A protein has these predicted regions:
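Amphipathic alpha-helical interface elements
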Residues: 1-135
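SF2 helicase catalytic motif II
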Residues: 434-472
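Conserved nucleotide-binding/hydrolysis micro-motifs of P-loop NTPases
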Residues: 240-242, 274-277, 381-383, 420-424, ...
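ATP-dependent helicase/translocase motor core
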Residues: 95-373, 382, 386-398, 410-414, ...
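Conserved helix/coil segment N-terminal to the catalytic DExD/H
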Residues: 406-414, 420-441, 460
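Phosphate/diphosphate-binding loops
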Residues: 256-260, 265-269, 448, 477-478, ...
């Protein structure tokens, strides 16, 4: 029975071994910055880690994490090929560690023939005892990792020398292996069925009349079908060493063939197994995404083709926003959205109604057919609670959920959350079938309260994961907004989508009353603040300003 399920447990063990290896690396390499959370996903996504690890190896360990999560959360069977891929990729990472930090490095090649194929008798009770001992060892290892910190300097020096004198060449993957190892797994993680009576994915799907040449055949790498039997999307796969955009022309030709056959043009993905691009040339622009989309999300996007309206003709509800500058902000965002821009920054002085403007924008985009699900992010639970209460007053007809205190309503139209809560929810929140609830295209609009550089630095993974329209809100004067915040929202000239500053609110709009300074003495003004005296939490808070 144990060997019958060996393929299912190998990914879990590989993931556990990878986690220990990654934590070891953090303990000895002082160039790595510890992320906010020390879970495996956060550790391998941290910017300095990505820059340190060999690019191909980093892509391979992402597969180990994904397959491990799939095995743990869904209970679905894992094939021998998938289990071997996970083991092979773990081997590549450990080999890279040896190459950089090992004392007696030897260039090795993964050899699956060394894995025993014959069944042998096992002592089940002995295995159970060993598993218990392993758990105890894990705790001991955690303690030993901390002792390694004093050796960081010597390890860093060894790494620099070893990389100059040693050779390391990770294996490239063929187009076929790319499909089997990485794209198939992404499809499974998004709930697609590749085989069986409920299969909704066709592989090497034949199309005719390529490039409008009668009888000329082509074979689509993947076609994703909806519940109505109509194609929702095509996937064009290329080797991992190739830019996924290389398959763009081929994907368009396949989509056009399917349009002639079915009367509707499917959306398109191009991918090399790691980097993926998506576009709907009927109603959207091409852009990178974290993975393929779920069936439900693709159907939503397909339906939206006929639902979208001209946003300039959608009346703004005066019951929500009746001030001219709030309406100007909404119109500015809507105009940019219709031009294909996906990131927007609103700079509005405190007290001028940022949350009210955000709810009115949500209302306009919803009635215009652009938005179904909304995510509102704030950095404190009190702000999340207040924002939900405000939205409830402004949009009483929409279902709302404060994810920080209520997991039951996570399918609500508008979800409110802190950044850490959402970071966990991305991988942990699942439906009865074990499929992810918060898929990459689940949210159509993401509102970021009090946008500042520390948020994008610490929680960048959230914004890279979700594919929705981003709207950042900040009260920081536009000239004081950090340059990298403008870069994040892709504004080259440090000019936001719309700005309504304090001076205008006081002197022109008379929305705010002026403030007056009263001079007082504090320890801060007299003695100053010294960074070394601050707690880590206070250092982070100070960094925001």
């Amino acid at each position: 029975m144990i060997f019958k399920k060996i393929n299912d447990v190998v990914p879990k063990w590989c993931r556990k071994a990878l986690e220990l290896a990654v934590k070891w690396l953090y303990s000895v390499d002082k160039s790595l910055e510890q992320p906010y959370k020390d879970n495996l996903q956060s550790l391998i996504s941290e910017k300095t880690f990505v820059q340190t690890v060999d690019p191909t190896v980093w892509l391979q360990i992402r597969y180990v994490v994904k397959l491990g999560n799939h095995a743990v959360h869904t209970g679905n069977q894992v094939s021998r090929e998938e289990a071997l891929s996970s083991l092979r990729n773990l081997f590549a990472f450990v080999q890279w560690l040896d190459y950089c930090y090992g004392a007696d490095y030897e260039e090795r090649t993964f050899d699956p023939s060394m894995i025993p194929t014959e069944k042998t008798s096992v002592d089940v009770e002995k295995i159970r005892k060993q598993e218990s001992l392993l758990q105890e060892k894990d705790a001991q290892i955690e303690g030993l990792l901390k002792q390694l910190e004093e050796l960081q300097g010597s390890f860093a020096q060894k790494k620099e020398t070893n990389q100059k004198t040693r050779h390391f060449a990770p294996n490239d993957l063929s187009e076929y292996a790319t499909r089997k190892q990485y794209i198939d797994l992404d499809l499974k993680l998004m709930g697609w069925k590749l085989e069986g009576p409920d299969a909704d994915v066709a592989v090497e799907y034949e199309v005719t009349d390529m490039e409008n040449k009668p009888g000329q055949k082509g074979y689509v790498d993947y076609v994703l079908f909806g519940k109505d039997g109509m194609p929702l999307a095509v996937i064009e796969a290329k080797r991992t060493s190739k830019d996924p955009k290389i398959g763009r022309k081929q994907a368009i030709l396949y989509a056009e063939c399917l349009e002639r056959k079915y009367g509707r043009k499917p959306m398109m993905f191009t991918t090399n197994g790691f980097d993926t691009n998506f576009w709907d040339d009927v109603s959207g622009t091409e852009h990178p995404v974290v993975s393929v989309f779920s069936k439900g999300d693709l159907q939503k996007l397909m339906d939206r083709r006929t639902m979208r309206k001209d946003l300039t003709k959608i009346q703004i509800d005066d019951k929500i926003t009746d001030r001219y500058y709030q309406k100007e902000a909404i119109r500015a965002v809507c105009e940019k959205i219709m031009m294909g821009k996906r990131k927007h920054l609103l700079v509005m002085a405190t007290g001028t109604g940022k949350t009210r403007t955000a709810s009115s924008l949500t209302d306009v985009l919803s009635r215009g057919g652009y938005v179904t699900n909304v995510l509102f992010l704030a950095d404190r639970t009190a702000l999340v609670k207040q924002a939900k209460e405000d939205f409830q007053n402004y949009l009483p007809g929409m279902s709302l959920c404060n994810l920080c205190i209520n997991k039951e309503d996570k399918n609500a139209r508008i979800v409110f959350s802190t950044y850490p809560t959402m970071l966990n929810a991305i991988t942990e929140e699942r439906n009865a079938e074990g499929d992810l609830i918060f898929t990459p295209a689940h949210f159509d609009l993401i509102i970021i309260d009090e946008s500042h550089r520390s948020i994008f630095k610490k929680y960048r993974a959230i914004f890279e994961y979700f594919d929705g329209i981003l709207v950042g809100l900040t009260a920081t004067p536009k000239d004081d907004v950090a340059h990298n915040t403008y870069n994040f929202f892709e504004y080259k000239n440090d000019i936001p989508t719309y700005a309504y500053d304090y001076h205008t609110a006081v002197e022109v709009g008379h929305v705010l009353v002026p403030f007056y300074n009263y001079e007082v003495k504090t320890d801060f003004t007299v003695k100053g603040i010294h960074n070394d005296d601050l707690s880590e939490k206070d250092k982070e808070r100070y960094e925001r300003f």
